[in-house]
Amino acid sequence: MFDRTQLSRRRFLSNFAFASGAVATGVGSWVIPAPWANAAEAPIKVGIATDLTGPIAYAGTADANVAKMLVKQMNDAGGLLGRPLELYIEDTASNESVAVGNVRKLIQRDKVDMVLGGITSSMRNAIKDPIVARGKTLYIYPQLYEGKECTPYLFCTGPTPAQQCDEFIPWLIKNGGKKFALPSANYVWPHTLNVYARKVIESNGGEVVFEEYYPLDQVDFSSTVNRIISNKVDVVFNTVIPPGVGPFFKQLYEAGFLKNGGRLACVYYDENTLNINQASEIEGLASCLDYFKVLTKENPFDAKIQAAYEKDFPGNFLFAAGSAATGTYRGLKLWEAAVKEAGKVDRDSVAAALDHAKIAEGPGGPAEMVPGKRHCKMKMYTAVAKGGNYEIVGRSNGLVDPKEC
């Protein structure tokens, strides 16, 4: 089984850069030049800052691939405002100190017109000031996250706790039980998400048996597993991330948690992360996201997006919601709509248009920014892992409000 938690630079290059015409401009830096050599005006510069190496490189590589696919589609359709788009990509390397230096390259050296990227909340917090405050550049953050990010000129296009918990947790109580454990990675997203999740659990008659935080590189969870089993926990609401999540789920399975009727839940789990464990080890795991691949069977536009991505990027780095690929798609298309409305690419003009931008079609359905909130309404889906795939078991009634800012 391919280990998604390890991705070498050589593997990345073979998957993305050399295969796609990208030109290396330094260590961890690539550019895909504007395709029109005789363009009358200078290209619009799109910056992508994401994890191309490190523990969550499977997600960052997919996000970079989505950006490449969409920028090519935009250029093939004539660009924006009659100008071609040029794509600049920086590796944030799952390392905040490295990321800050590389993001500065996008701002100071490449002078991009916008930056999209960051996966973990700690990464967003590290790079937002170099982009927005010091760099005076528009920033789009595409990943599901813990909420409360209300920085001007920073727009969030992934799901928030309200979108992921308000309907999902009552479903878990009905289809799992009332006794919850909250095992968590020790960084900002789990801490803040758990505050919200606990309120929803308790307001719906559930109980949080325990809430624990672990180092991001921890792989031995024997004491946690024992605590879950001995306390007869019904639902494990997990926010442990790679590399620890695979060993944790395996240890839970081996202790009989699933066999005894326990329910796994993880709101970032998508098709990429399904493959971290053997299917039997996470059978019945429930997730709540803005898109699952199984939607392609019922939605022609989802099928079109998925087919285009898989044609351009066959292999191990999947188009999936928990990896921020859908938020990347949504963010770039909303930005495109804003640029068209603004008729220019300066930060203030685009931000004013992006504040109320809408797209009629996108992964999982339409989406629209909530005016004045810099967050996005979208459809949400609850799915359960069965035999190594997902099955939709619930869906929102229309677009769900992010309830932020």
For each predicted feature, which ranges?
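Segments of small-molecule ligand-sensing domains
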Residues: 311-326, 332-392
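N-terminal secretory signal peptides
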Residues: 1-34
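Extracellular/periplasmic Venus flytrap/periplasmic-binding protein
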Residues: 98-101, 146, 152-255, 295-304
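Periplasmic-binding protein-like
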Residues: 106, 110-119, 140-142, 181-184, ...
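Extracytoplasmic "Venus flytrap"
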Residues: 47-66, 90-96, 119, 183-191, ...
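C-terminal segment of N-terminal export signals and the immediately downstream linker at the start
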Residues: 29-50
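Extracellular/periplasmic periplasmic-binding protein-like sensory domains
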Residues: 252-329, 396-402
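Beta-alpha junction/loop-to-helix N-cap segments that form part of ligand/metal-binding clefts
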Residues: 58-65, 78-148, 157, 215-221, ...
